[in-house]
């Protein structure tokens, strides 16, 4: 079976969804920009040699509809002979895109693929056009479709206090800002055109979503966002709304070496699981355990973790049940996470994987694990091994 390697991984800056940098930039343009950039950074691979493009996106309507993967590829002037498909596993869409490409390469059906994802939550809101079947209520609580209430449920089940959530959220912003200031994101962010507050066109090379002034004291003043009576989850301890895209160049190890391209990491294992929709945020626990089992590893073997921060109330139970509470500051989301950077749904899987690869190199660790929860009760995880 072919070994699957990541040759390169990049992303756009994360733009604020409400009146942010990309308010006049379409999702297809963000995607096409990264497709062009990946190919330009790796000229040894001719675009025509790509076997397929796998692109994650959740809200596949309006500018993100009608197979945005193909639309973006055409905008990027990728040869017409290269196919493209849009992948949707809700929050796990772009990680699923990676898994799909990896399996094609493992089986010998492909040698090179471009994977990634996008979500412009400012142009196409998360709830746009959603219409759940009323019959679902026979099997699933209505609140299971309300992500904030599923986070409240996890907080109550696992004893995650308001104070713990506020502290974790403040940490996310502090670490993301420190990473920005130190240049830790420079190897992954591709400068991207947008508009500043005055409407002037400029190149953005930083995440505008981060709030460096965030403190535990300020977060403590916010009202509960989803359960006004007894809730603990606030807007400040939830992932920010942002616009962005991320992309990775995935190849068989043999083809990469044949072209003289240096692999950055191997895909060691992949896993997807289902869980109770009422606690959808718990999905990373069984997904990570399954991915570790497939890799023949344990959590203690993993040098760094990237766990998508849908909510502080959601990620803390996952950290606890993976036995990592005492290692948060050594292993978990060392450059902050979605609470600070935002969670553009179709982008996040590739985004956290990209950040993880850079952290693995910076920390000089062999293994890294990226995982995320998925709305309606799923989890997805990938174990990477440095080459």
From Swiss-Prot:
Keyword set includes tRNA processing: no
Reactions listed under catalytic activity: an acyl-CoA + acetyl-CoA = a 3-oxoacyl-CoA + CoA
Function description: Catalyzes the final step of fatty acid oxidation in which acetyl-CoA is released and the CoA ester of a fatty acid two carbons shorter is formed.
Compartments in which it is found: Cytoplasm
Name of the protein: 3-ketoacyl-CoA thiolase
Residues at the catalytic site: 91 (acyl-thioester intermediate), 343 (proton acceptor), 373 (proton acceptor)
Pathway per the UniProt entry: Lipid metabolism; fatty acid beta-oxidation
This protein's encoding gene: fadA
């Amino acid at each position: 079976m072919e070994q699957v390697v990541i040759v390169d991984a990049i992303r756009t800056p994360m733009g604020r969804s409400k009146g942010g940098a990309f308010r006049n930039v379409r999702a297809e343009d963000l995607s096409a920009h990264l497709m062009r950039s990946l190919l330009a950074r790796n000229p040894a691979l001719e675009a025509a040699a790509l076997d397929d493009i796998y692109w994650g996106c959740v809200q596949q309507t309006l500018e993100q509809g009608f197979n945005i993967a193909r639309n973006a590829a055409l905008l990027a002037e990728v040869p017409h002979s290269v196919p493209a498909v849009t992948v949707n596993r809700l929050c796990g869409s772009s990680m699923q895109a990676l898994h799909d490409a990896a399996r094609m390469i493992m089986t010998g059906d492909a040698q090179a693929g471009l994977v990634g994802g996008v979500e412009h939550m400012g142009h196409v809101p998360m709830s746009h056009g959603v219409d759940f079947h009323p019959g679902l209520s026979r099997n699933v609580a209505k609140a299971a479709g309300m992500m904030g209430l599923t986070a409240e449920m996890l907080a109550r089940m696992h004893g995650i206090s308001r104070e713990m959530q506020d502290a974790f959220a403040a940490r996310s912003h502090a670490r993301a800002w420190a990473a920005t200031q130190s240049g830790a994101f420079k190897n992954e962010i591709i400068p991207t055109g947008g508009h500043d507050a005055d409407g002037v066109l400029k190149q953005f090379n930083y995440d505008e979503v981060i709030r460096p002034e965030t403190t535990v004291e300020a977060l403590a003043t916010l009202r509960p966002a989803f359960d006004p009576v007894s809730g603990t989850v606030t807007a400040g301890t939830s992932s920010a709304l942002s616009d962005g895209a991320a992309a990775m160049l995935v190849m068989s190890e043999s083809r990469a070496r044949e072209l003289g391209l240096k692999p950055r990491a191997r895909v060691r294992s992949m896993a997807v699981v289902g869980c109770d929709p009422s606690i959808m945020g718990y999905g990373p626990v069984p997904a990570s355990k399954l991915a570790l089992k497939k890799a023949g590893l344990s959590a203690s073997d993993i040098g760094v973790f990237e766990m998508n921060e849908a909510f502080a109330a959601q990620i803390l139970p996952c950290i606890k049940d993976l036995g990592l509470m005492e290692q948060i500051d050594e292993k978990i989301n060392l450059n902050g996470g979605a609470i600070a950077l935002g969670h553009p749904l179709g982008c996040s899987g590739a985004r956290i994987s990209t950040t993880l690869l850079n952290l693995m190199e910076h920390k000089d660790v062999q293994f890294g694990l990226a995982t995320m929860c998925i709305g309606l009760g799923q989890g997805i995880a990938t174990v990477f091994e440095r080459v």
